[in-house]
Amino acid sequence: MSALLFDEATHTYTAGGVVVPSVTQILAPLNDLSFIKPEVLQYKRDLGTAVHKATELYDTGELDESSVADVVRPYLDAWIRLRAELPFEILGMEERVFHPAHRYAGTYDRLVQLDGKRCIFDLKTGGMFPSYGPQTAAYKNAVEKASGKRVEGRYAIELRDDGTYRLHEMTDPEDWQVFLGCLALHRFKNKHAA
């Protein structure tokens, strides 16, 4: 497999020295965020990043709870509550994956063992979007390609600002086809960009 590298500053993945699109870039046409003020969008991105980091540090046992910002705390509490109420084993966390046949990359939040099944968990701090199904399908297929092991479930975990969570199982059988359609559109636009 080609070495997968990620440049944090530019949010760019490269495989074997060639830039490959991210799952987020590929699915961008499904999420019209143009009506959201840029500063609000940036705030939401920063909040999501902080919540992801807090949950990751919590799961690795490295979190200094006194360092958690007040705005992040309810989302972390929601994750801690989910961990207590839904027993699962974490198999992988914040892992970058690359699909060599379809040439895309992404970073999944958690690969877990839940009720005897390997599942993708994608943590969310905002509203639920239809693109989350194709997003988790992309991660599922890349993980399966890399590991040779089946992933049997996909979930968007909605962490809420009141300390609660909602578990959304992604079951639409068309999610993978939607992702591949977006990938074809992404390639077409890049090929014909002026």
What are the residue ranges of the model-derived segments?
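Nucleic-acid nuclease catalytic cores
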Residues: 70-71, 95-189
